[in-house]
Every structure is written in structure tokens, then in C-alpha cells.
């Protein structure tokens, strides 16, 4: 990789997304399910097929549910088993985050998952963005041996969090990678890179795909109260990924 190249990680909600992202030139993918909930653990079948079909690295999400990051003992047990299974089935890394009820990092539980990850990449996700003391939290992650932190700079989107992201990158040095992610689009890529000096970015690149199998009874819905169209779903857009990669050359 060229020294000044910006690494592009595409957030994917399915193996189909990951394959399209790779075709478009992505350097790495984050593999999840349920992106509407912020990303949950993908199925083991997805991870097995990802290992068989992808040439680029993929980082598997381990998150048992939406709605926060303070987990019960039962949820923690599931996360530990998912981490072991994802590693055994070939994931290049694990992305996760566990907080205490006050929003601080649950260091004891994070260390348990970190130990199971072993020599694979350990990534702390945007749970970081609700921690009360970002620099204390970053010190904890460094001490635990995390590879990388995904963050929007404790704001809703990266463009809003640019000042903190820049400070985090400067503070981290070469002790941990800082990966800006959240609200990055084709039109603001350059702004993010120039304002922060980041060496990698994390974003989605979707288009709408139709599934006509439900058109016969359009009044039947399967989702929650928002009732998204049942004949549509989002899939990674290979051409948009290629534009993103091309913009950063």
C-alpha cells in the first residue's frame, strides 16, 4: 500500500455487500447484520462464506442486540461464544464494545473478549462515542491492546466531530489506529481527511435493490413500526465504492 494511501473500510450488512465492496476496490470490510440497528453480529454462515469468497480482510461485528452497550451475563456469554466462533471461522478481526451503566468502558468484560480475539485485530466500535471521558477511554483501549478505534468524534456524524477526531489521532500517535466513521459521504471525504489527517475511513455505500417476491400482497409487512417497503432492501453499490476509492487517490 502506498504510504499516502487512505485505507477504505466499507460497512456491510451482508456477504453480498462485502463482495460488491471488494469489487469496487475497498481495502477492508466490517461485516455485520441489521445495519438499521447500528450493526449486529452476522451469522456464522455469513462469516464462513466471507472467508471462502473474499480476498480482502473482514472484521466481524460482535454485538448481540441493539439499544446500548451494557450487557447482561447471558448476553456476555453469547458474545464470548460468537467471538470464538468468528475467529475459528476465519474473521480477520472482531469489532465490539462494552460499557458500564454510566457509559464508561467496562474494562473487565472488554479484557475477556480481547483475550479471546488473540492475535487477530481488536476494534472498539462507536460505543466510545458515548463515553464520558474520551481520552481516559482511549488510554484504556491502548492499555488493553486494541488495534483500532472506530469513532465519530463523540458527535452524531464525523463532520460534526472533526475537532475531537483530530485530537484523538494526535494523542494516539502510533499506539492505536483511529478510524473515523459515521456520516462520511462521497462529498465530504476530502474534508474529513484534510481536517483530521486520518489514514483510513469507514463508511457505507448503498443503493436500493428490489425484491418483487412480496408484490402480490403489498399490505403485509414484516418489520417494526416504521414499516419500510418490503419490496426493497439496501445493497452495497460497487460503482459508488469505486468512486470513493478514486476520490482518495
Set out the residue ranges of the language-model regions.
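Glycine-enriched alpha-helix->loop->beta-strand junction motifs that scaffold or abut catalytic
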Residues: 24-29, 54-57, 90-93, 116-120, ...
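N-terminal amphipathic alpha-helix/helix-capping segment at the start of soluble metabolic enzymes
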Residues: 1-11, 51-52, 217-220
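Active-site-adjacent beta->alpha loops and helix N-cap segments on the catalytic face
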Residues: 16, 35-56, 74-77, 98-118, ...
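A short acidic, helix-capping loop that chelates divalent metal ions and anchors anionic groups
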Residues: 66-71, 227
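N-terminal pre-domain/capping segments
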Residues: 2-29, 34-41
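C-terminal alpha-helical cap/extension of soluble enzyme domains
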Residues: 173-249
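Hydrophobic faces of well-ordered beta-strands that scaffold small-molecule active sites
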Residues: 6-10, 29-31, 58-62, 94-96, ...
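Catalytic cores of alpha/beta
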Residues: 13-23, 70-82, 129-144, 168-170, ...
Amino acid at each position: 500500500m502506498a504510504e499516502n494511501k487512505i485505507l477504505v473500510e466499507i460497512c456491510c450488512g451482508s456477504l453480498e455487500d462485502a463482495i460488491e465492496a471488494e469489487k469496487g476496490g475497498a481495502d477492508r470490510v466490517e461485516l455485520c447484520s441489521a445495519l438499521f440497528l447500528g450493526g449486529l453480529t452476522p451469522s456464522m454462515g455469513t462469516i464462513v462464506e466471507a472467508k471462502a469468497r473474499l480476498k480482502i480482510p473482514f472484521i466481524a461485528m460482535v454485538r448481540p442486540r441493539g439499544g446500548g452497550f451494557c450487557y447482561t451475563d447471558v448476553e456476555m456469554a453469547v458474545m464470548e461464544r460468537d467471538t470464538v466462533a468468528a475467529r475459528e471461522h476465519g474473521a480477520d478481526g472482531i469489532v465490539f464494545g462494552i460499557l458500564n451503566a454510566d457509559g464508561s468502558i467496562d474494562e473487565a468484560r472488554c479484557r475477556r473478549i480481547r483475550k479471546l480475539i488473540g492475535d487477530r485485530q481488536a476494534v472498539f466500535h462507536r460505543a466510545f462515542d458515548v463515553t464520558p471521558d474520551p481520552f481516559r477511554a482511549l488510554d484504556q483501549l491502548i492499555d488493553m491492546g486494541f488495534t483500532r478505534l472506530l469513532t465519530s468524534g463523540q458527535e452524531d456524524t464525523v463532520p460534526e466531530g472533526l475537532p475531537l477526531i483530530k485530537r484523538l489521532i494526535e494523542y494516539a500517535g502510533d499506539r492505536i489506529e483511529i478510524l473515523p466513521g459515521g456520516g462520511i459521504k462521497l462529498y465530504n471525504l476530502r474534508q474529513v481527511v484534510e481536517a483530521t489527517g486520518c489514514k483510513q475511513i469507514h463508511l457505507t455505500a448503498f443503493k436500493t435493490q428490489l425484491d418483487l417476491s412480496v408484490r402480490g400482497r403489498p399490505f403485509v409487512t414484516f418489520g417494526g413500526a416504521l414499516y419500510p417497503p418490503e419490496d426493497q432492501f439496501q445493497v452495497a453499490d460497487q460503482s459508488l465504492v469505486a468512486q470513493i476509492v478514486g476520490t482518495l487517490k
